[in-house]
């Protein structure tokens, strides 16, 4: 098994900075308000070229939320974003967002920053957004 900090592939990704994809993987947002679940990736794990992700955002009690979800796709080691933003749709039956296509067009480390703001009727503490970062090594 590779040592932490040593490249795991020939593309410059390190074990310490890349997440290992598993369906249903979760991260708590940077502000601690919401949980971001990567329900699925097609293909799985995320791969070179176009991907489709299903993401669910939940409150602290695990209740799925509706609102506005966006994603920033970039390669931190290369200093550039993906050339195209995915279309984002919300399915009220599953309370999940589909993002498609997620263009991971080069090999290397990709940072996916999901940002969410819930639907609320008034400007309040509950309307404040949160974000979470997933990093995947694409080879």
How would you name each of these model-derived features?
Residues 2-111, 115-139:
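Contiguous segments within soluble domain cores/interaction surfaces
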